[in-house]
A protein has these predicted regions:
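Short, small-residue-biased leader/transition segments that mark boundaries at the very start
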Residues: 3-4
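Phosphate-binding active sites in nucleotide-utilizing proteins
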Residues: 7-23, 37, 43-44
């Protein structure tokens, strides 16, 4: 992965990725509906990093804007930060990113399932299903600021416990 010498703000990072994605889609001459889905997915692909445990792991100031990248740290520093963060082993921010966008219909545009699939399969961890259910993904009191824990838990149960995510993956594979 990339080495960042300085902290990178989450909103700046996602906006930069969305803009690069838009330019690339335009240069490739992709169909507008596909370009829109890619750009929306890029804009929200790291929303799960707003989880307060993830921010703690990155060393973010709880009163400052959310971080996407922590800046340069040694392997030992990164390991200690992960251990102190209360994130369970195997927790993936892209799963929470997909959940947060699913819980915010205004972020998905017309191609909801495609946007969610791209987000959930980002970072080279594309998977047909996630190993973790709603109880593993969320922890009350650590949800991103401005989100409703109960609403997120309800949506997470639908997506990851009941099986909507698996259906979504199957439908968008065709």
């Amino acid at each position: 992965g990339d080495v960042y010498k300085r902290q990178v703000l989450l909103d700046d990072h996602q906006n930069d990725v969305a803009e690069r994605t838009r330019q690339l889609a335009e240069n490739l001459g992709l169909a507008p509906e596909f370009s829109e889905a890619l750009e929306l997915a890029a804009k929200y692909h790291d929303e799960g990093k707003r989880d307060l445990r993830f921010q703690q792991m990155l060393g973010a100031d709880p009163d400052a804007e959310a971080l996407a990248k922590s800046g340069h740290r040694s392997v030992a520093e990164a390991y200690r930060a992960r251990s102190r963060s209360a994130l369970p082993r195997g927790w993936r921010h892209e799963q929470l990113s997909a959940l947060m966008v699913a819980a915010s219909p205004e972020k998905m545009g017309e191609h909801r399932d495609l946007v969610l699939r791209i987000i959930g399969c980002s970072h080279g961890h594309g998977r047909f299903s996630f190993d973790h259910d709603a109880g593993f993904l969320l922890k009350e009191g650590y949800q991103p600021e401005g989100t409703d824990y109960e609403a997120l838990k309800e949506q997470a149960t639908r997506l990851f416990n009941v099986g909507y995510w698996d259906n979504l993956m199957e439908q968008t594979s065709r």
